[in-house]
């Protein structure tokens, strides 16, 4: 047996050596991907954690990344380095008592480790910014989930929105995230879908009234559509505000991304 171990050990070590690189910390400033043969639009993707009930809606983030990749964009992912409002046990839909998580650390799961603190995001280095939904947008990027129309927006999120808007660079938001633009950008036009629940198809339809109360204009759109506010260069789509098949949500996000990229002029 000793002889067998002597023979096997070096071979095992050699076999595992190529895998070791996957355990190294990736460069935080590296783009997640760059699929264009020539420089395309540089897009900042802002996450709010990992998981629909207390962070980023993962399917939305993935759909955005797929459509950005297809559009030849270079993507860099950001998230605020702050504690989550709370942690939800996604098997029960209930808060996990005595547990806390960090928004940046959780968002890194979606970014495959390639993530940067939102405090380092400078609009001058990017052509557009996109915010996926998930309750993290209403809990970690703002207090909308608790305070509704009287909500406050995270100071770094507010800064980023104002910087991109001031520079006339496009901003994309989906699902519940349009409330961020409604709060920060005066008179902006956004959509979160329909304004009536319609038998449960639009369970969060009441959000439209809160958006109006914030001084924004709500525009009714279907789940596969995106609304483009040409004046403010803000593009929104309902995504998971609608109870529907995943491919419809994917298509709506595709419409949002397409319009954002077109507005960059790249």
UniProtKB/Swiss-Prot annotation:
Modified residues (N6-succinyllysine): 201, 221, 231
Principal place of residence: mitochondrion
The keyword Acetylation is assigned to this record: yes
Entry annotated with the keyword Acetylation: yes
Modified sites of kind N6-acetyllysine: 149, 155, 162, 201, 217, 221, 231
One GO location term (cellular component): mitochondrion
Transit peptide as recorded in UniProt: 1-39
InterPro entries: Class_I_gatase-like
Keywords (A to Z) from UniProt: Acetylation, Mitochondrion, Transit peptide
Localization of this protein: Mitochondrion
Family statement drawn from the similarity comment of this UniProt entry: Belongs to the GATD3 family.
Protein name according to UniProt: Glutamine amidotransferase-like class 1 domain-containing protein 3, mitochondrial
Organism of this sequence: Mus musculus
């Amino acid at each position: 047996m000793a002889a067998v171990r002597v023979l096997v050990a070096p071979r095992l070590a050699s076999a595992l050596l190529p895998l070791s690189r996957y355990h190294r910390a990736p460069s935080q400033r590296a783009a997640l991907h760059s699929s264009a043969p020539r420089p395309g639009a540089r897009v900042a993707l802002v996450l709010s954690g990992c998981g629909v009930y207390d962070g980023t809606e993962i399917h939305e983030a993935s759909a955005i990344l797929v459509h950005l990749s297809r559009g030849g964009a270079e993507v860099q992912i950001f998230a605020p380095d702050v504690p989550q409002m709370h942690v939800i046990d996604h098997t029960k839909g209930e808060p996990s008592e005595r547990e806390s998580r960090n928004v940046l650390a959780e968002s890194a799961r979606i970014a495959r480790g390639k993530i940067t603190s939102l405090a380092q995001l400078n609009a001058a280095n990017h052509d557009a910014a996109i915010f996926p939904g998930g309750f993290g947008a209403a809990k970690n990027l703002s207090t909308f989930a608790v305070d509704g129309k009287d909500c406050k927006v995270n100071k770094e999120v507010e800064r980023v929105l104002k910087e991109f808007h001031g520079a006339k660079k496009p901003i994309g938001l989906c699902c519940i995230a349009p409330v961020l633009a409604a709060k920060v950008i005066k008179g902006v036009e956004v959509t979160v879908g329909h304004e009536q629940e319609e038998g449960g198809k639009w369970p969060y339809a009441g959000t439209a009234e809160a958006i109006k109360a914030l001084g924004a204009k709500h525009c009714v759109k279907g789940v596969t559509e995106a609304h483009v506010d040409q004046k403010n260069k803000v593009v929104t789509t309902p995504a998971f505000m609608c109870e529907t098949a995943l491919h419809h949500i994917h298509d709506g996000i595709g419409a949002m991304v397409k319009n954002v990229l077109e507005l960059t002029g790249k």
